[in-house]
Curated annotation (Swiss-Prot):
Family listed: Belongs to the RecO family.
Function: Involved in DNA repair and RecF pathway recombination.
Protein name per UniProt: DNA repair protein RecO
Presence of the UniProt keyword DNA repair in the record: yes
GO cellular component: bacterial nucleoid
Family matches, as HAMAP family: RecO
Amino acid sequence: MATKRIGDEPAYVLHRYDWSESSLILEIFTRQYGRVALVARGAKKPSSSFRPILLPLQPLHIAFGGDAEIRTLKSAEWQGGHVMPTGDALLSGYYLNELLMRLLARDDPHPVLFDAYSATVQLLASQSVDTLQLALRAFELRLLRDIGLLPLLDAETATLAPLEPQARYVLVAEAGLRQAHDDDRNSLPGVQWQALQQALGDNALFSDTVRACIPGLNELKTQLRALLHYHCGVKVLKTRQMMMDLQAL
């Protein structure tokens, strides 16, 4: 059987680890093929053209081939466009990568999610704290929606009853969206949930999702964190624990 070769594919490195003294195994997020595992032969050699560009959060165009579970990286070209994020923005980028590693199956294409990821990475590179938080919340929503883990945000999950614009609702991992109880913190009014649902529509831009997160930014952070931890099967993600440890120093 002929080996399939893919060329000029937009991609980002999610994770990399040693495979031999000179080579790396890469987890790559591609636009048309989803998350794929590739071996980069000789990438650790000082003379390798791969060495300076196989970095996380950097836009690449790659070529790869093979029909095994782990295919072979043939070429990689850096696309430029922004500098490497630093500080909190860099940790936030690693957080995005951890989410994708935990929640995306291999070889499952998500081109719209790829575009949202690319837009988020560019926003992280802007170094604005406010922009950073908005970008993270918007991407979390897009990710959960794209992989089918986000309930409709304009109806109660249990009854499918439309939301009342002024009533308050909470997003709960085990139950979806429900009306808030007196002791529920971080609830949002129905009108804000409805706006978020609209901003996640098939024709909505990522910038629409970012803007829709502005009114309930703090409340969304808590609820989305709980939902993501639930679906990732962990109490705290590694990158989030790293952030908390650094803040405690």
